[in-house]
Amino acid sequence: MEHVPRRRLQSAVRLVAALSAALVLAGCQAVGPDRPSAESPSASPNAVRQVVVIGDSLSTGFGTGPQHGWPNLIAASPRDDAPPLEIRNSAQNGSGYLNVGLTGTTFAWQVEQAVTPEADLVMFFGSVNDLHHDPAALEPAVAEIYAAARQRAPQATLLVVGPPAYSALPEARRLAVRDLVKRQALAAGARFVDPIAEGWLVEDLDRFVGPDGLHPTVEGNHHLRDKMEPLMLEALRAGSAAAG
């Protein structure tokens, strides 16, 4: 895989306050410079773009440390062609669209806490934590969460990345969650990306997934960074073009 050179941290982003630093397992960080008003989101190619990440422990660096989570990896060393970024990582360990995480939260809480009118992009990733929930209850919850994100940030682009698989033959319930998330993402006007169909983690499970069979290794987090960053930048460019 070809890697694009990356800027130094000090020339691109800086850490800003976390949504709740007191949460031990929250994995909730915001990184980037202060952003200008959202009144002119495409006014300048140098305008800071605010990205909100909604997700679970696959986005927090669980098992390796927050610094290794793919959102922090992008923020710490963005590609040379990336605009100035403020990445607000609201992901919570154990959370899902319907599943309540270790801090008592779901994706709905993350949207409420992190998505503001200033957001340029809201990225959803997951969630494998929803596999045991009844699809009949899960699907309307997914739809409501996307609607809430739209309401809180009408100008933002929505990018939805479905749950990954850890086998070339994923179980039926995983595919069912993927399918309903895709349906609701497209209904909400979001772009949907399918890690199962693209084989994100099954490319090399021994390298990318830790001994628990679920969470990324350090190398796996870098692999997710390499998958997510082009999607993020493409979505930001598309949003800027539409706004312009």
Segments (PLM) and residue ranges:
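Oxyanion-hole/transition-state-stabilizing segment in secreted/luminal serine hydrolases
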Residues: 104-139
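Serine-esterase "nucleophile elbow" of acetyl-processing enzymes
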Residues: 29-93, 112-113
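Catalytic His-Asp segment of secreted/periplasmic serine-dependent ester chemistry enzymes
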Residues: 167-244
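Structural recognition of the beta-strand scaffold that forms the well-ordered cores
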Residues: 50-55, 59, 86-91, 120-126, ...
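Acidic/histidine-rich helix-loop elements
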Residues: 63, 88-106, 213
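Conserved catalytic region of serine esterases and O-acyltransferases that act on ester linkages
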Residues: 2-14, 29-31, 226-244
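Active-site segments of SGNH/GDSL-like serine hydrolases
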Residues: 125-129, 148-179
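C-terminal motif of bacterial Sec signal peptides marking the signal peptidase cleavage site
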Residues: 24-27
